[in-house]
């Protein structure tokens, strides 16, 4: 069974580097989940989410490299879910899963949303604190069990904190 590999990044640049590296490993932006606070999205992605620039950069090539385009595109287009009241923005497969469940985790707050996304409660509490302080959580479901360890090491090497596979 494939495993969800997650890591918490303190900066947009570090999160972008992680998304770029995951894509270079053969994953697509549709395989990558991004979670951040609404405040972080507003601060870090205000320009991209208000325009079609992110989508155009992905389609048009490598404007400034894959990283800027890919992370911005994940947060600006595709499956995205905003959980009002708890200020969480979720994009990617985790958003699709929560939307399919009627976003049941929203009633339990941020930790409930993370647990609903498949993250154990004790880890969700750690990620909750990181997201509230401006962190960006990147998650990717490994295509195979043997790839999970490689993804875990990759995220750690790129500066992620609290890297885990579930």
Regions inferred by a protein language model and the residue ranges of each:
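Cytosol/matrix-facing juxtamembrane amphipathic
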Residues: 2-50, 101-166
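Small-residue-rich hydrophobic membrane-insertion segments
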Residues: 49-126
């Amino acid at each position: 069974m494939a495993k969800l590999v997650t890591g918490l990044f303190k900066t947009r640049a570090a999160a972008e580097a992680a998304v770029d590296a995951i894509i270079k490993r053969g994953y697509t932006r549709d395989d990558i989940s991004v979670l951040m606070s609404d405040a972080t999205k507003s601060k870090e992605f205000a320009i991209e989410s208000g325009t079609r620039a992110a989508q155009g950069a992905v389609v048009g090539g490598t404007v400034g490299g894959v990283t800027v385009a890919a992370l911005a595109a994940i947060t600006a287009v595709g499956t995205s879910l905003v959980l009002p009241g708890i200020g969480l923005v979720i994009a990617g497969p985790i958003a699709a899963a929560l939307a399919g469940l009627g976003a049941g985790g929203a009633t339990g707050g941020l930790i409930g949303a993370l647990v609903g996304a498949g993250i154990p409660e004790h880890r969700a509490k750690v990620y909750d604190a990181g997201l509230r302080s401006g962190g960006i959580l990147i998650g990717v479901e490994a295509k195979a069990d043997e790839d999970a360890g490689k993804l875990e090491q990759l995220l750690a090497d790129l500066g992620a904190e609290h890297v885990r596979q579930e």
